Amino acid sequence: MKTKELSYYTNGIEAKNTVILSQSITLVESSKKEHQVLAQQIINHCLPLSGNSIRIGITGVPGVGKSTFIEAFGTFLTGIGKKIAVLAIDPTSQQSRGSILGDKTRMDNLAVNPDAYIRPSASGKTLGGVGQKTHETILLCEAAGYEIILVETVGVGQSETEVFSMTDFFLLLMIAGAGDELQGIKRGIMEMADAILINKAEGDNLIKAKQARREYANALHLFPAKESDWIPHVELCSALQNTGIEEAWNIIESYLVKTKTTGYFEKNRKRQTKDWFYKFLNHQVLTSFYEGNGITEQLKEIEQQVLNGEISPF
């Protein structure tokens, strides 16, 4: 990727040019040192322009209909005058390190909506399945004037924890009768969820969905109270039939009013910023260590000694 002057990117972002925004995000995601230097300058410039959006994490097991929901939800939001950015984290092959990056094809309306910006990003081997630079991408999207940032996760492993640590509201999508094998994933993310939506509540599945709503609502009472003092909602929706979408937004608005009034919203944002500072610091320290003179060769020697049982791995 051939780079340009800093002002090209910063002026483009402030002018809400999506092509230049995409180019800037590509620089942020790049592992090349020259790109990283320029990307940091772009982020530093955009930092004062960021922080004014609502960041919403959306997760759920594969097959729950996340992309269909985001298509319906995003269309509703732009319909009431909001500008939204969708950061869709795609599953990545651990062997080929390739990515499907198919979210734009699954969000036909949003892909051509002038008030929506979709940025697929490979999850790679990053802890949690969330693109390593997702937090910086959020800042750039905010600087470009997007009022609502939707972060969709791969819905497996530790990805929910990562998204929870960079968003204001955490939305869990579920479907009725998903099977007992998913209970482990459900419990872990249910404790973080600010709202649970039972998707695909339509047709013959409506009765099952209502039963699931009762079960999840009962289960939530068993969890400790949230620090925000917010009581999570459990509601039904059908992204396919466009029902329950406006209600989902009303829940989020109620959450924002409550947490901004109590001061929790600002407190949580500052805590997230501090956490990400230390994550970045740890990453930089490790990177510097592995790039040190002769480190790779020394590690290989030590590794072989460990494998031979000559020294302890601890």
Label the predicted regions:
Residues 5-53, 64, 73-159, 166-169, ...:
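Nucleotide-state-sensitive switch-loop elements of NTP-binding domains
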Residues 14, 28, 32-36, 63, ...:
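Conserved phosphate/pyrophosphate-binding and hydrolysis machinery centered on Walker-type P-loop NTPases
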Residues 21-23, 236, 247-314:
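Long, well-ordered amphipathic alpha-helical subdomains in the mid-to-C-terminal portions
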Residues 56-58:
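Hydrophobic anchor at the beta1->P-loop junction of P-loop NTPases
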Residues 100, 137, 162, 166, ...:
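Alpha-helical scaffold elements adjacent to nucleotide-binding pockets in ATP/GTP-utilizing enzyme cores
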Residues 178-207:
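Flexible active-site lid/hinge loop adjacent to a nucleotide/diphosphate
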Residues 195, 201-261:
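Canonical P-loop GTPase G-domain recognition
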